[in-house]
Amino acid sequence: TVINVKCTSPKQCLKPCKDLYGPHAGAKCMNGKCKCYNN
């Protein structure tokens, strides 16, 4: 799921993704936006 959080690295996405999807969520930075995924 792409969320409306700007990023330059996946580390910036980890907290918002975990906040939204729980502690097992993963995060990537794609095209300057965070992408969350559940493993």
UniProtKB/Swiss-Prot annotation:
Signal peptide: none annotated. The record marks 37 as: Aromatic residue of the functional dyad. Expressed by the venom gland. GO terms for cellular component: extracellular region. Disulfide bonds join 7-29, 13-34, 17-36. The record marks 28 as: Basic residue of the functional dyad. SUPFAM superfamilies: Scorpion toxin-like. One of its GO terms (molecular function) is ion channel inhibitor activity. InterPro entries: Scorpion_toxin-like_sf (IPR036574), Scorpion_toxinS_K_inh (IPR001947). It comes from the Eukaryota. Keywords: Disulfide bond, Ion channel impairing toxin, Neurotoxin, Potassium channel impairing toxin, Secreted, Toxin, Voltage-gated potassium channel impairing toxin. Negative results: does not inhibit calcium-activated potassium channels (KCa3.1/KCNN4) of human T-lymphocytes. Does not inhibit voltage-gated Shaker potassium channels. Does not inhibit rKv2.1/KCNB1 potassium channels. Belongs to the short scorpion toxin superfamily. Potassium channel inhibitor family. Alpha-KTx 02 subfamily. Blocks Kv1.3/KCNA3 voltage-gated potassium channels of human T-lymphocytes (Kd=0.71 nM). This is Potassium channel toxin alpha-KTx 2.8. It comes from Centruroides elegans (Bark scorpion).
